[in-house]
Structures are given as C-alpha cells and as structure tokens.
Amino acid sequence: MNPLVIKLGGVLLESDDAMKRLFEALVDYQKFYKRHVSVIHGGGRLIDNLMNKLSLPVKKKNGLRITPSEHINIITGALAGTANKTLLAWALKYNINAIGLCLADGGSVDVERLDENLGHVGKAIPGSPLFLKKLFKEGTIPIISSIGITKDGLLMNVNADLAATALATTLQANLILLSDISSILDGKGQRITEIDSIQAEKLIMQGIITNGMIVKVRAALEAARVLRRPVDIASWQNTEKLKLLFNGVNIGTRVYV
C-alpha cells in the first residue's frame, strides 16, 4: 500500500478535542494496518493570532500569506516551533513514535522563492524520499511543518497545502487534506462527493469556492495530476470515519484531475 500523507489545518491545531480524535484514530488505525504515515501541517490561525498580539499586519494575496523579512522569524517560530512541537507532544502522549521536522530536513522537500512581491513565501518542489523512508522503516511518523529553506539558506513560509502536495509527490503517497471543513460544498451548501478540474474551476468562477479554499482545491488538483491518483479533502470531526478515510474510503470530497 502506498504511504499516506495527512495534511492538518483549520482549527485542528488549536482544539484539544480535534487532537484527541485525530491521534485516537491514528492509534487505532496502526493497530490493524501497517501503512507508512506522514503528517504535515501549517498553522495559519496560530500565526494570525500571534501577529495580532504583536500588532503586526496580516496580508494575503490569492490565499497566500505575504511574509516580509521582518516576519519570517516569527512565523518560523510559530510553525516549526509551537505548532510542530504541540503535535509532537500529542503524538508522544498517545505513545506514537514520532519526530518533528521541517521541509528541509533530509532534503525531503526543496524550496525556492515563489514571488519577490510575497517576500519569504516559498514554492515547494519534491525532494528526496530517502530520509523519510528510513524513518518509516524504524516505525517513526514524521510530523513536518511547512517551513522550508532555500539552497542559499533563506527561511521560507510555504502554503501547507502546496507543501503537502510536494511531500506526497516525494513519497509517491496518497494525500488527505484534513481540516474543519468536511467537504467542498455546492451553491446550495450540499456536499460534493467528487469533483474534477473542470467542475472546480466553474465553482471558482461562480464565486462558490473562494479565498483559501481556492488554494486548497488547486493544490489537490495539482497533487491528483502529479500523483495520478485522487486526493481527499475531509474533516477530522468523526474518529470512526477518520479510520475509514485513512484506509481509502471517501468521507468528504474526492478530487480528480
């Protein structure tokens, strides 16, 4: 079975209940299945809250956070520090053998500057799977923040959905984009069980898919195209359904090319 990359987002990183459900599902899943799992995360809300406390502006362009040089150390501390180690602490609480990493560790995901106008915002490029495969053999779950480092040593903030796509490509893994959003919704607020690129772009043009969800959907479409397999967008809210999701059952929206 292909490895599984689980991207975490939304309120999950700030909710003890969400963490509990996620790690209970992971523990139960690993009792019955020997699939290699890697977790990757952002932390947008955590960063927003921190920036507000520091009275620093939060600006985004096309769903991507503008990250000037004076902000990158703060964002790195929030993502590679607080968010990553909080997830690691939960894993250890549930006796899961895990390690906290960033995209650059082991050359797993390479990063280039995406756009000078966005500042320290990186483009994620698939890297080498060797380090992560070694961890898998040792029974370790990598928990990876979406902070990357360029070849010339610059820290970069990478959109976590796009980072997850690059990581899944590196590992030739199945990808789940997990958040508080249970699925893509149509114009009537109903769940869309399956969607392809034509349908997705139509909903974007109609203003039904907006803001950060545009980035998420396009990241899923790109991942589906590169990986040549569908990508799931789903919610963490039901532990039993999570276990089904980890085993390939569609509980949210399945994205096809």
Swiss-Prot record:
Main location, first listed in the record: cytoplasm
Keyword entries, A-Z: Amino-acid biosynthesis, Arginine biosynthesis, ATP-binding, Cytoplasm, Kinase, Nucleotide-binding, Transferase
Lineage: superkingdom: Bacteria
GO aspect biological process, one term: L-arginine biosynthetic process
Localization terms from the record: Cytoplasm
Recorded GO CC terms: cytoplasm
Positions bound to substrate: G43, G44, R65, N157
Family to which this protein belongs: Belongs to the acetylglutamate kinase family. ArgB subfamily.
Protein name: Acetylglutamate kinase
Lineage: Bacteria, Pseudomonadati, Pseudomonadota, Gammaproteobacteria, Enterobacterales
